[in-house]
Amino acid sequence: MNNLFRSIPAVDLCLTALGQADPSLVEAPRGLMRDLITEFWDKKRHEIREGHCKKNEQLTLDACLPGLMTHVRAGLRSRFRAALNATGVVVHTNMGRSVLAKEAREAVITAATGYCNLELDMQSGGRGSRHALVEDLLCRLTGAEAALVVNNNAAAVLLVLDTFCKGGEVVVSRGELVEIGGSFRIPEVMEKSGATLREVGATNRTHLHDYSAAINENTRALMRVHTSNYRIVGFHSAVPLPELAALARRHDLPLIEDLGSGSLTDFSSCGLPDEPTVPSVLAQGADIATFSGDKVLGGPQAGIITGRKDMVDTLKRNPLTRALRCDKLCLAGLEATLRLYLDPEKARQKIPTLRMICRPAEELARAARTLAAALRKGLAGSSASCLVSLRADVSRVGGGAFPQYDLPTTLVCLKPENCSATALKAALLRTDPPLIGRLEDDSFCLDPRTLSAEDRPTLLRVLREALALAAKEII
């Protein structure tokens, strides 16, 4: 054991060896390099003490240089990395949700590259409002009197409740008390706003008289939460929006609609059910509608508030609005995305989220056949050999939208000859970029819905690397 400890080289020797093996490391931050080298050898020391070293293992610099190099490169690599999405989940929360349109990406780069008119009044040259940058567009697209953008939809709901319902009660159907992901629940957001939740009805059935009976002198608003991430089926009923809006008006109360993922377009032509759009809920009587910018809208992360001008103006004056506001990059990307919606057909072609959701099954089948042929050719021989097959399956919209509805697709499934599909999946997490797919019946499957033709060369490369790595680790 002592001999193993003594064989561990000095940090300076390691720095020199790493620089000789990879000259680009000479430019790496010296302090971080030293810490990474120390971290690597500390782990080796722990393995020695615990008796976990392999028999006859050598801890010389030459023997450990490949492992040390891998550890150092991993430590120097940016934590924020691009990835290939082959899951078929279009709005993949874990992978950054919506992919921005080319126009939106260019707008973000322009805003990031230099100064801009974020809060500059272009008429007077004085202080302006960042809210004005997208408000007119949102009003045109939704039919709202006014609009406000904050940094996500949970923030939008929090701001609305803090402004209009703090210290009072909000009446909500028990069947709409959703969990919105990451263990965050609508009742908890309400509690943080200072509003008191007043549940009405049963989980599966709520009637107009349930809302009416709950209204009292402490009631500040009626609220509907669109259950976009789950469905209640069977013996079920909910109050139609126009009826609830009429009840709210009779009692001089605002009706707040939390649409969650939110949409400006009708997806029924893509084979999906008729979901409420932002313009439709405002037209049917909602005073305020909140929704996300980075889900089926296809833009950057944002919480969008639309509705009555007097209410939106009050929201703008709430000090909490400053804490929740968006920066110039978000607003630039959102404006560019919204401008594409001025031509609905152009939006479906140019906004990746809409394009992927609406890709026809026949087009996906052709894409799968083309990809399968490329994989059979590109992975033939050596440790990368795989059995490649096609399988009819389904994709998901994701992001909590359309949870019950399937999008027909064709999967390209790989069954490796020299490792398991599970080992391949694990190895693909370590490639650059990582490739995320699906495990289906001992196969690793790729859904072309969320891949493009431009991804193919990179996809082939990382698959070859991962198959070789997985096979080597088994040996």
Curated annotation (Swiss-Prot):
Organism: Desulfovibrio desulfuricans (strain ATCC 27774 / DSM 6949 / MB)
InterPro entries in the cross-refs: PyrdxlP-dep_Trfase (IPR015424), PyrdxlP-dep_Trfase_major (IPR015421), SelA-like (IPR018319), SelA_trans (IPR004534)
PANTHER family: L-SERYL-TRNA(SEC) SELENIUM TRANSFERASE
GO MF annotation: an example: L-seryl-tRNA(Sec) selenium transferase activity
SUPFAM superfamilies per record: PLP-dependent transferases (SSF53383)
Pathway where it operates: Aminoacyl-tRNA biosynthesis; selenocysteinyl-tRNA(Sec) biosynthesis; selenocysteinyl-tRNA(Sec) from L-seryl-tRNA(Sec) (bacterial route): step 1/1
Major location (coarse): cytoplasm
GO biological process terms held by the UniProt record: conversion of seryl-tRNAsec to selenocys-tRNAsec; selenocysteine incorporation
EC number(s) reported in the record: 2.9.1.1
Subcellular location field: Cytoplasm
Gene Ontology cellular-component terms listed: cytoplasm
Gene3D superfamilies associated with the record: 3.90.1150.180, Type I PLP-dependent aspartate aminotransferase-like (Major domain)
Disulfide bond residue pairs: none
Cofactor: pyridoxal 5'-phosphate
Record's protein name: L-seryl-tRNA(Sec) selenium transferase
Modified residues (N6-(pyridoxal phosphate)lysine): K295
Function comment: Converts seryl-tRNA(Sec) to selenocysteinyl-tRNA(Sec) required for selenoprotein biosynthesis.
Enzyme class name: transferase
Family: Belongs to the SelA family.
Native organism taxonomy: Bacteria, Pseudomonadati, Thermodesulfobacteriota, Desulfovibrionia, Desulfovibrionales
Keyword vocabulary terms for this entry: Cytoplasm, Protein biosynthesis, Pyridoxal phosphate, Selenium, Transferase
Catalytic reaction list: L-seryl-tRNA(Sec) + selenophosphate + H(+) = L-selenocysteinyl-tRNA(Sec) + phosphate
Superkingdom of source: Bacteria
Coiled-coil residues: none
